[in-house]
Structure formats: structure tokens, C-alpha cells
Amino acid sequence: MIRILLSNDDGISAPGIQTLASALRGFAQVQIVAPDRNRSGASNALTLDSALRITTLSNGDIAVQQGTPTDCVYLGVNALMRPRPDIVVSGINAGPNLGDDVIYSGTVAAAMEGRHLGYPALAVSLNGHQHYDTAAAVTCRLLRALQRKPLRTGKILNINVPDLPLAEIKGIRVTRCGSRHPAEQVFCQQDPRGQDLYWIGPPGEKYDAGPDTDFAAVEQGYVSITPLQVDLTAYMAQEVVESWLANTEVDGEW
């Protein structure tokens, strides 16, 4: 039986992770290690300045107190799930993680930590808040396929599912990340003592939503699968930077 470490960024009681756990337990051994509260937008944050405490629930699920998604996967792999998992799954997120969203997403970060620690990893998001059962069914189907034939890319699979009944899903597309215009809006308020409060505004509008992007696939009713990698090196820019250094003589005599 496949062993799955399951985490998220919406918190341990979120409907997405609970729906997915129920579906996965039909054919897998599942250990939930998730934040005790919503940590959306936590990205790859790792808690280094304080100790982490856990609460083990009556069903065996583990909540990490004030933990980030990355904390949860790190603890799950290195301390809390024994034997260790075969795969790390993050989700189901309430709302999509498309395009530039992946740099902020705690859902994607949890999967990235799993991959960084040497495990296959999936991040699963629903383009809405209704049909979690659809996203769970898609995830189960992919995991069963991975059991039959492992995918040895060494990459994270970022999966975005349209918020539709399963029968209305048109299929699966392998995509690239689209992009958004930068978000510039900040909401300023004052508390009762006159101190300024700032709220981060909504994400920017779509900028690159071409036919091969994750945006386009989900909008057209397809499940989007975008391979992501931990290595952020821009290999094609290395020669450009080398040439620039030579031409500007920055790397000259010190």
C-alpha cells in the first residue's frame, strides 16, 4: 500500500485536505501533517527562530502549531511519519495556484519541500470552493497511475482542477506557467487608536494566458499539470551575465 504524507496551506480542518484524505484512504496509507491554521501565501517559509509543537488529533492527523506548510512536510518526513512516505501530496487548495501564484503558494511550497527532500510530490488546487470531490478524484487517478508506472522526472507536478463536476472535465493538459500583471493595490485603514493598517490587495490580472498556459487550460475546462522544479537557475542567462561582466569590467582587479 502506498504511503502518502498529506499537507496543505489552508489548515488541517480545511475541506480540501479532509476530502482528499478520505478519498486517498481508499487505497493508501495517509498521514496528515498540516498547519493548525490557514497559512496561505506562506511560500517556502521555514520556522528557524522558535521550537515547533504538534497536536495529534483522535484520528491520528497531526496539526503543527503555528507551523508553515514547509515546516509540516519537513517534520513529517524527518520525524513524524514512520515508515517514511512514498510520496508527498499537498492540497486540495481552496482556489487556484496558476502562473505567478506559485511563488507565493504554500500549497506549492509544501510539495516543493517534499521534492527537495527526495520524494515525488504533487500540489493540487481547485479553481474555486465547491467541487473538491472532482479534484480528489483527479488526484486519486493520477496517484494510481504513478503506482503503476512511476514518473521519474524529478519535478513537482502542480495540478490545477476546474471547479466543475467530474463529468464535465474535458481532460488533462500539460502546461507552462502563465503570468499576471504586477499587483499594486494596497488597502490602508486605521485601527481605533489611529494606527495605520495595511492589507495586501488582490493579485494582478492575467498578462500571459496563452493557449499552452495553465490559465488557458483551466478556463477551458481541462485539468492543468505544470512540471515545476526546485532548481531556479536560469541556465540560458548564464552566458549573458558572463558577457556583461566581461564588458563592464566589474570582475577586474580588486
From Swiss-Prot:
Subcellular location field: Cytoplasm
GO cellular component entries: cytoplasm
Q: Which UniProt keywords apply?
A: Cytoplasm, Hydrolase, Metal-binding, Nucleotide-binding
Q: Does the keyword Endoplasmic reticulum apply?
A: no
The cofactor note reads:
Binds 1 divalent metal cation per subunit.
Obligatory cofactor(s): a divalent metal cation
Q: PANTHER family, alphabetically?
A: 5'-NUCLEOTIDASE SURE (PTHR30457), 5'_3'-NUCLEOTIDASE SURE (PTHR30457:SF12)
Role this protein plays: Nucleotidase with a broad substrate specificity as it can dephosphorylate various ribo- and deoxyribonucleoside 5'-monophosphates and ribonucleoside 3'-monophosphates with highest affinity to 3'-AMP. Also hydrolyzes polyphosphate (exopolyphosphatase activity) with the preference for short-chain-length substrates (P20-25). Might be involved in the regulation of dNTP and NTP pools, and in the turnover of 3'-mononucleotides produced by numerous intracellular RNases (T1, T2, and F) during the degradation of various RNAs.
Its name, as the record gives it, is 5'/3'-nucleotidase SurE
Coding gene? Answer: surE
